[in-house]
Amino acid sequence: MNIKKARKILKNKTIGITCHNSKKLIKEAIHNKTDYIAIGSFFYTKTKKVKSRASIKTLLYAKKITKIPIVVIGGIKDTNYKKLLLNKANFLAISSYIWNNKKLSPVKAIRKLK
């Protein structure tokens, strides 16, 4: 669904657009006044099939051309999240590391992200 249709249905709710690793999609998201831009997958993940990985270069490009918050997604865990924050990601979307972690409970997994 495009963002214009989503806005009609959801009114003033927060709406984001996943742009994968595409500068073109980032520009479209900005033009369509999205509330946040998601970029990824940055790392291997079992959550979704990923055709190609997102790059730090794309994250930095998005940060350079917009003030819209950037959410990074895909395979983020305790050993790689800092690289994304150091490169100006506003938010981290972390799922499998927390909920499907075979070594740590969700609470302990979250605590390792400090």
Model-derived regions, located:
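Hydrophobic/aromatic ligand-binding patch that stacks against planar heteroaromatic rings
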Residues: 28, 62, 83
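Alpha-helix-loop-beta-strand connector modules within alpha/beta enzyme cores
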Residues: 1-22, 50-78, 111-114
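Structural motif
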Residues: 32, 65, 86-89
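Histidine/lysine/aspartate-rich catalytic loop segments that bind and position anionic ligands
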Residues: 16, 20-48
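Residue-level detector of anion-binding/catalytic polar loops
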Residues: 35, 69, 90
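Electropositive, surface-exposed helix/loop patches at the edges of structured domains
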Residues: 32, 36, 75-83
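Glycine-rich phosphate-binding active-site loops on the catalytic face of alpha/beta enzymes
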Residues: 1-5, 38-50, 81-113
